[in-house]
């Protein structure tokens, strides 16, 4: 390849890569929109269709293990953490992975019941494409991911809640 073509080829490759990321975010945004509607309407079937419960429970288990197995933690706490992380994460998942719990999280971030749910293009603009093919949403454009979605058999499903776990509370 001659030196003149190298910058042109690089620009073309970057353009193609950006187009893929945009298509990915637009595709994901349709399912994210459906999840937001399910949360707002307390639609358990639609919510479950857009949530990977097993992945979220695994994440809870990992967080429990990270805390209980941390350096300096006493042996009793480590043993209890190792023995109870999986059953506790399953129980917590049953209680917390529900539309009304995620509605409380949405309200914390400013989405009230009377707030219009953004359309697919607005959601796509708020999503960040991740190097591993997933997408995530952050409170601020350059901020950390709060929730992450993965394409599972053609449906973008919530696979990770990266925000503060203390926000996941049963409604009172």
Positions of predicted regions on the chain:
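Bacterial N-terminal signal peptides that target proteins for export
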Residues: 1-9
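Short solvent-exposed beta->alpha transition segments
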Residues: 51-128
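Post-signal peptide N-terminal segment of mature Sec-exported envelope proteins
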Residues: 28-49
């Amino acid at each position: 390849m001659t030196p003149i073509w190298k910058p042109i080829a690089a620009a073309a490759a970057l353009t193609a890569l950006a187009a893929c990321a945009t298509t990915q975010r637009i595709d994901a945004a349709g399912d994210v929109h459906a999840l937001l509607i399910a949360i707002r309407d307390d639609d358990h079937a639609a919510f479950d269709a857009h949530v990977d419960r097993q992945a979220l429970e695994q994440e809870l288990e990992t967080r429990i293990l990270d805390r209980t197995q941390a350096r300096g933690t006493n042996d009793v706490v480590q043993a209890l953490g190792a023995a109870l992380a999986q059953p506790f994460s399953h129980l917590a998942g049953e209680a917390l992975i529900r539309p009304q719990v995620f509605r409380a999280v949405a309200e914390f971030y400013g989405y009230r019941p009377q707030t219009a749910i953004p359309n697919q293009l607005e959601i796509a603009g708020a999503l960040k494409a991740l190097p591993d093919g997933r997408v995530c949403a952050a409170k601020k454009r350059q901020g950390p991911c709060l929730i992450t979605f993965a394409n599972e058999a053609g449906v973008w499903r919530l696979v990770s809640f990266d925000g503060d776990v203390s926000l996941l509370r049963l409604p009172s």
